[in-house]
Amino acid sequence: MKIKKINNQKVQYFFKVSSKELETQLSSAYEKIKSKVEIKGFRKGHVPRKIFENHFGKNNLYSDALENIVQTKYQEILQKKDFESMGMPQVIDLNEKKLKDNQNFTFGLEFIVKPKVILKKYLGLEITKDELEVKDCEVEEKINSLLEKQATLESKTQNNSLELTDTAVFDFEGFVDEKPFEGGTAKNFSLKIGSGQFLPGFEDQMLGMKQGQNKDINITFPSDYHQKKLANKKVIFKVTLHQIKTKKIPQLTDNLVKLLKLANVSTVEELKNNTKKTLLDQKKHKEKENIKKQVIEQLVKNSELQIPQEIISQEKTHLQKEFEKQLKQQNLTLEQYKQYLGIGDEKMEKEFNQQAQKNLQYRLIIEQVAFQEKLTISKEKIEQQYKNLSNHYKVPVNQIKQNLPEKNLQHSLLMDEALDLVINKAVVVTK
């Protein structure tokens, strides 16, 4: 093994691999898939490697063998603990011809060295926070919002006219150039007036109508209308209003509160107290996040570090993949998301890049705080956190451990402890 230090950011290791070692890994790679191999004339799982290679080629085996060799060498270097690396190493200077000819071959691994962080000040930071208070009007607004959800729609009397926030039930038929157009007709259509659900100007012209009334509504399709052939076209909608419904909000009483079936709440007074507590908890959470943001901003400002672009790119790719997973759960693609928000590729890339840089700055700085303060996480604390997660997600501890390796959990707890230390040592000024 040969070592070559490029600069303070990169270290390269070069290896010689014998044909014998390669053959061992090729055999191992084939043994892993042998039981699934099927070729006519041979029993499943009993196909000789030579026959497999003649039918399917050698590339898959060589790829798996090389991956095993790289992983072995990678672990050897990590165990030496000569330096701290970030991300996965890159394979360099691989002699593929010799590899595929089953000869002795060479390759290298290029590591990104963990950047050095210089912390100028991290204890005694000055942070500001608001006086936490929940006003009566905030409680009232929250309860009114809850009552809104319990509201029912009731029909207005014949003489009443259509007003803002009413729901209209009506028929309509649209005409462009005196001809009906596709999608321009509906029966007993329900529309909340003021919702902006219909074409601009339509709802405004319906205001004041009475049940049973007919009216022609004249509007122009927007220039960016999704049906291009209708864009900028003048349209007449012939409308017949059948019914006007208005929202009736229930009166706040103990009986209504009981019907809501809220935990530990059965009276108006209890609802008010519970709502006040919930709002206060929300403000505390928001305050905690704001303090965390202030601390991180000051730590970044008070630190010196240079993050290699390769690591930022790796983090950016990771963020993008995770974001795409989240979108997939909502049956969306990244392209659809960008179209929906009107964001171009360049802006999206820039946002991912900035977030990647922030994540790395935070991680490296907090890790340095933990190092300088000699913080450690005990086995007991790790096990307790596994139990907490198990109780929270209602799944067995073993399942949590399978999805969250101990090393990752330990690092997460260490980061939390280091950040808490900085926050607890900060000077808090209340506005």
Swiss-Prot record:
<keyword id="KW-0132">Cell division</keyword>
<comment type="similarity">
    <text>Belongs to the FKBP-type PPIase family. Tig subfamily.</text>
</comment>
<keyword id="KW-0131">Cell cycle</keyword>
<dbReference type="InterPro" id="IPR046357">
    <property type="entry name" value="PPIase_dom_sf"/>
</dbReference>
<dbReference type="Pfam" id="PF05698">
    <property type="entry name" value="Trigger_C"/>
</dbReference>
<dbReference type="InterPro" id="IPR037041">
    <property type="entry name" value="Trigger_fac_C_sf"/>
</dbReference>
<keyword id="KW-0963">Cytoplasm</keyword>
<dbReference type="GO" id="GO:0061077">
    <property type="term" value="P:chaperone-mediated protein folding"/>
</dbReference>
<dbReference type="GO" id="GO:0044183">
    <property type="term" value="F:protein folding chaperone"/>
</dbReference>
<dbReference type="GO" id="GO:0005737">
    <property type="term" value="C:cytoplasm"/>
</dbReference>
<dbReference type="GO" id="GO:0015031">
    <property type="term" value="P:protein transport"/>
</dbReference>
<comment type="function">
    <text>Involved in protein export. Acts as a chaperone by maintaining the newly synthesized protein in an open conformation. Functions as a peptidyl-prolyl cis-trans isomerase.</text>
</comment>
<feature type="domain" description="PPIase FKBP-type">
    <location>
        <begin position="165"/>
        <end position="250"/>
    </location>
</feature>
<dbReference type="InterPro" id="IPR008881">
    <property type="entry name" value="Trigger_fac_ribosome-bd_bac"/>
</dbReference>
<dbReference type="InterPro" id="IPR036611">
    <property type="entry name" value="Trigger_fac_ribosome-bd_sf"/>
</dbReference>
<dbReference type="GO" id="GO:0051083">
    <property type="term" value="P:'de novo' cotranslational protein folding"/>
</dbReference>
<dbReference type="InterPro" id="IPR027304">
    <property type="entry name" value="Trigger_fact/SurA_dom_sf"/>
</dbReference>
<dbReference type="GO" id="GO:0051301">
    <property type="term" value="P:cell division"/>
</dbReference>
<dbReference type="GO" id="GO:0043022">
    <property type="term" value="F:ribosome binding"/>
</dbReference>
<dbReference type="GO" id="GO:0003755">
    <property type="term" value="F:peptidyl-prolyl cis-trans isomerase activity"/>
</dbReference>
<dbReference type="Pfam" id="PF00254">
    <property type="entry name" value="FKBP_C"/>
</dbReference>
<dbReference type="InterPro" id="IPR005215">
    <property type="entry name" value="Trig_fac"/>
</dbReference>
<keyword id="KW-0697">Rotamase</keyword>
<dbReference type="GO" id="GO:0043335">
    <property type="term" value="P:protein unfolding"/>
</dbReference>
<keyword id="KW-0413">Isomerase</keyword>
<dbReference type="InterPro" id="IPR001179">
    <property type="entry name" value="PPIase_FKBP_dom"/>
</dbReference>
<dbReference type="InterPro" id="IPR008880">
    <property type="entry name" value="Trigger_fac_C"/>
</dbReference>
<keyword id="KW-0143">Chaperone</keyword>
<dbReference type="Pfam" id="PF05697">
    <property type="entry name" value="Trigger_N"/>
</dbReference>
<protein>
    <recommendedName>
        <fullName>Trigger factor</fullName>
        <ecNumber>5.2.1.8</ecNumber>
    </recommendedName>
</protein>
